[in-house]
Curated annotation (Swiss-Prot):
The keyword Nucleotide-binding is assigned to this record: yes
InterPro entries: aa-tRNA-synth_I_CS, aa-tRNA-synth_Ia, Leu-tRNA-ligase, Leu_tRNA-synth_edit, M/V/L/I-tRNA-synth_anticd-bd, Methionyl/Leucyl_tRNA_Synth, Rossmann-like_a/b/a_fold, tRNAsynth_Ia_anticodon-bd
Biological classification of the source: Bacteria, Bacillati, Bacillota, Bacilli, Lactobacillales
HAMAP family reported in the protein's UniProt record: Leu_tRNA_synth_B
Principal EC category: ligase
GO annotations of cellular component type: cytosol
Alphabetically ordered keywords of this record: Aminoacyl-tRNA synthetase, ATP-binding, Cytoplasm, Ligase, Nucleotide-binding, Protein biosynthesis
Cellular compartments annotated: Cytoplasm
Pfam families cross-referenced by the UniProt entry: Anticodon_1, tRNA-synt_1, tRNA-synt_1_2, tRNA-synt_1g
Gene field: leuS
Protein name: Leucine--tRNA ligase
Region forming the signal peptide: none
Amino acid sequence: MEYNHQKIEAKWQKYWADNKTFRTGTDKNKPKFYALDMFPYPSGAGLHVGHPEGYTATDILSRYKRAQGFNVLHPMGWDAFGLPAEQYAMDTGNDPAEFTAENIANFKRQINSLGFSYDWEREVNTTDPNFYKWTQWIFTKLYEKGLAYEAEVAVNWVEELGTAIANEEVLPDGTSERGGYPVVRKPMRQWMLKITAYAERLLEDLEEVDWPESIKEMQRNWIGKSVGADVTFEVAGTDKSFEVFTTRPDTLFGATYAVLAPEHDLVDAITTPEQKEAVAEYRRKASLKSDLARTDLSKEKTGAFTGAYAINPINGRKMPIWVADYVLASYGHGAVMAVPAHDERDWEFAKVYGLEILPVVEGGNVEEAVYTEDGPHINSEFLNGLDKAQAIEKAIEFLEEKKIGKKKITYRLRDWLFSRQRYWGEPIPIIHWEDGTSTALSEDELPLVLPVTSDIKPSGTGESPLANLTDWLEVTRADGLKGRRETNTMPQWAGSSWYYLRYIDPNNSEALADPELLKEWLPVDIYVGGAEHAVLHLLYARFWHKVLYDLGVVPTKEPFQKLFNQGMILGTSYRDHRGALVATDKVEKRDGGFYHMETGEALEQAPAKMSKSLKNVVNPDDVVEHYGADTLRVYEMFMGPLDASIPWSEEGLEGARKFLDRAVRMIENSEIKAENNGELDKVYNETVKNVTERLDLMYFNTAISQLMIFVNAVNKAKALPLEYANGFVQLLAPFAPHIAEELWVKLGNEAGISYVAWPTFDESKLIESEVEIVVQINGKLKAKIKIAKDLAREELEKIGRESVAEALEGKNVVKVIAVPNKLVNIVVK
């Protein structure tokens, strides 16, 4: 019998809402568990089946922990500021706030249809002034501490978006992450956050959290700590000098030329008249490229000679000074000493321009290829014969003694570009006065509410559309001094850098959150979301958390104790002979193959990321309607390991539904008895043990496998003890909560399974008391019998002979071989 999922799911969702079943527990005597999802941006497209994978995982853990007696905080909210809503509003003439509210309502409907146990009383929305009051408050604290400052910086400007974007939002091909538009470098007044002040702590404290090693490594690389030396180079024939940071001061004897970034302050001053034109043209071209495009290792090296020379401080040799875009003004000092024999980029550059390549580490033929391994130093006077570590130490000693350099630690991490020239974001709570000073708004002036306007097109001047709203923009102080509000808004990352704190105390109008409640709930016990947020969101949130820790606002150094990245659910896609993806509506299936409708070309079927353009997005609404939410939940958890990327499959969905149908039939059709005859003892206790252990490890797929094993065992058993029927339904409940609630009541229990104590197992019943042995005559199988475990040989022989007594009639038994717990073989003549 199939159950009616639509009726059952609607019934229990109403029950949970009416009874506020998932309201966060506040019993001080219970341990706490804070399960957090990366909150979504509520797009117009709604949820796709990839979203619920992570949400189901945290929901399973939340339901499991409630049953284990924990106070569980499991909230949901909306990361609702950002470019897409604004872009949509500009394209359609709609208000981004209205569009966002509609999208949130749709997301919420979809999320509720999946039976997630969120405490909706804690819902947050980054665009709500009661929320962003505290985003702005954090900004004022950063400003007071000197961690938010204005600077004229070369930004990644995207003309089509009318805004600057952060380095992290530029793709490797030099286009914008959002929209894929060209990115150019342009100097602008910007707000910056001094994340570099926290570089060392952001690095060190990674040791304190239980995160995937791959994510930690990505953060380490992004922070990019380098230990080396600053070295001073004088420009020959002038009183000018420049500094270079190098991680390899031991290779100074091999430095044969120097390279300055095109933006370096010295370039104009040292370029000779003959080279002026070439250098100016080179700098113009470089300004059109993004940092990522400039540092792409695979691109051809380009440069321009300045006509000037530097003096190598270690041996007095003259070195030509070049300008090249592979050197960034923002890294080190915007200048490098080039050691082409032992650095890939320097070697390629030297080969293009015919510059000297002098080996200073033994090994390899540097005319043929760069040599980057270790080895004894050569051509290096007092460093000859030393290995890398010894030579670095000695070189730094020499530089410091001669006062031409010193030991230095640098970081690849840059300060965070925090302003956007757009309307749909948090206003930055700063006023610029006509006397040249700026002040932050005080707490009682917050929130500075984003004014409602239909004119949200970028101003075209590089300012945000807020610059057009003079009533809002212009202010006058009590003493008559005039001022202008800051027109830049915050990036979408602002609200998501602290939202997890607001869930703890979402309605507090006096503080970001009650310190006692923060003490009670922090850190987050499990944070689940996509690995694509490894650098941006997770690094920014850790930075803000550390600032708040220093301010005494939060009690922990780190926000998220354990992080888990779910894999991606891939859609069906098709590729042509060039490997190009073809949209599913352009594909026909015939003769057992797939063909392009327009060209007739045979196509290869292969999984790929779900996308609107490929028309392979699966909408969870359709799945819930046809199969039910419980089926979708079980299927997504059973597909494979939670962190693996796996293709979507209708067959897998049907398999999950069949399992639930079998579980329902098992409860409805089994002979359920109050007494226990012991035949299911082992499999039941194994099931409780395995499911419990696997939930702790987040091995949800193998936990479901164990539930399937139990159902199979019950179908072969004579009867199902009531205790085991109840226990099974409890184990099923985190995965398939609607049907579990229904079966729980069917078994005669009071409605509401969420807080019933989690089943326990009896260790002694995990040991099999019986074994099945085979009985053979002359090596041929004659019988299989169940006997008590560990019987003595004599007893085993006796039972074996009795079980095949008929076959032995008239035969002469020569000998009996008995192997305890395995077999009895009777040799006859």
